[in-house]
Amino acid sequence: MAAVVAVSLKRWFPATTLGGACLQACRGAQTAAATAPRIKKFAIYRWDPDKTGDKPHMQTYEIDLNNCGPMVLDALIKIKNEIDSTLTFRRSCREGICGSCAMNINGGNTLACTRRIDTNLDKVSKIYPLPHMYVIKDLVPDLSNFYAQYKSIEPYLKKKDESQEGKQQYLQSIEEREKLDGLYECILCACCSTSCPSYWWNGDKYLGPAVLMQAYRWMIDSRDDFTEERLAKLQDPFSLYRCHTIMNCTGTCPKGLNPGKAIAEIKKMMATYKEKKASA
């Protein structure tokens, strides 16, 4: 019996040794592959108005993806911290909540904090500020007009009887509350508005998809008493009706919302409002 066990051990041990060697070799190869530099190029829009004679241009940076987080914002922060401290961009939450880091990445408007880096090392990732906006510096667009338009729709609850304000809750049914889903989640990043050709050419008059979706959000809020007044403010030819349902807005929204549908609903409400007004 002992002889049989000895023979079995002799047969088993060399195989185990060989298997262990193979496993170590595989691990070594994986480690070598992991530590080999993975150099990714980023071409980033640069312009500094404080530099006399400076013109907009693209500047290329190289990042080793082995030493960088997975998101485009990680790469931008690494570039600013370790390579070029003059690179300027907005950022805050890093979780797709605040909308600060909205920019155009590889041809599409999105959030740098939620867009993963394209790991194809043969392709250069191109990063621009949001299109058709005045640029303050580098990747920072001037959102003054965008915020002024948002302010113009009075994006807050309005009551005609304010005698009970602060004294009681304004209740909603479950069904009434569900109407706001897909609207209130907007983070005002302006990705949708700056992807809209109508907003590119009429941004001074056309409110754009982001602002109109928020206008709709308050129009259908059962607690608000100023739906008709809100509609009346949008009757001119530009504020609402420059939307031609191109739907770039819906395609680019980083939160998966549908501004195009909201605008279509406003147009339907506007038709009903005008009929009611004409028959009055």
Curated annotation (Swiss-Prot):
Its annotated compartments are: Mitochondrion inner membrane
Q: Which residues carry this modification: N6-acetyllysine?
A: 51, 55
Which positions does UniProt annotate for [3Fe-4S] cluster binding? 196, 243, 249
Q: Which cofactor does it need?
A: [2Fe-2S] cluster; [3Fe-4S] cluster; [4Fe-4S] cluster
* Activity regulation, per record: Enol-oxaloacetate inhibits the succinate dehydrogenase activity.
Alphabetically list the UniProt keywords: 2Fe-2S, 3Fe-4S, 4Fe-4S, Acetylation, Electron transport, Iron, Iron-sulfur, Membrane, Metal-binding, Mitochondrion, Mitochondrion inner membrane, Oxidoreductase, Transit peptide, Transport, Tricarboxylic acid cycle
Its placement in the membrane is given as: Peripheral membrane protein
Instruction: Specify the protein name.
Output: Succinate dehydrogenase [ubiquinone] iron-sulfur subunit, mitochondrial
- Organism the protein comes from: Sus scrofa (Pig)
